[in-house]
Amino acid sequence: MATKVSQIATTKVYVVKPNVTIAEAAKEMKEHNLGSLVVIDSQNRVVGIITERDIVKAASNRDIDSPVEKYMTKDVKGVTEDTEVTDALDIMLNNGFRHLPIIKSNGKLYGIVSIRDLARALLDVHTMQFGKPAEEVKGTGVICPVCGMEIDEYGYCGCGTGSG
């Protein structure tokens, strides 16, 4: 049975409203060591996501007092709770995302997964399939399930997750 994103999701998601300033969002992200914040409306529906990249763009424009809605990604490509981990990873890799909201059918937030969460889940599958973690199969011709490259003699692969 394939792993679903709901099985590995972070369900305690930090959110902001669209009118919060970039400076306030950056402070929240720093305080909680986050790479993104999900933006929700007054009905708690997902309307966007603000990421570190967006914060850097605003800062480089010297525009940190603007609301996050000016810089957030508005067309959020979220997934549903029953999306398989491999499908979520495919969406993230094809779109350059590092975070992917999990959105319920009513438009409200269920949770979030990061590229790191997905890589860990796939490495767990790797361990189940081969009986050993990636660092124990380094240099043996074993392929990383995330990037498809061989895990080298140092325990690394092309995407850096093969080291476990």
Swiss-Prot record:
Residues 9-66, 72-128 form the CBS domain. Gene3D superfamilies: CBS-domain (3.10.580.10). Transmembrane segments: none annotated. The keyword Repeat applies. It comes from Acidianus ambivalens (Desulfurolobus ambivalens). Disulfide bonds: none annotated. The keyword Repeat applies. The lineage of its organism: Archaea, Thermoproteota, Thermoprotei, Sulfolobales, Sulfolobaceae. It comes from the Archaea. Keywords: CBS domain, Repeat. This is Uncharacterized 17.7 kDa protein in bps2 3'region. Signal peptide: none annotated.
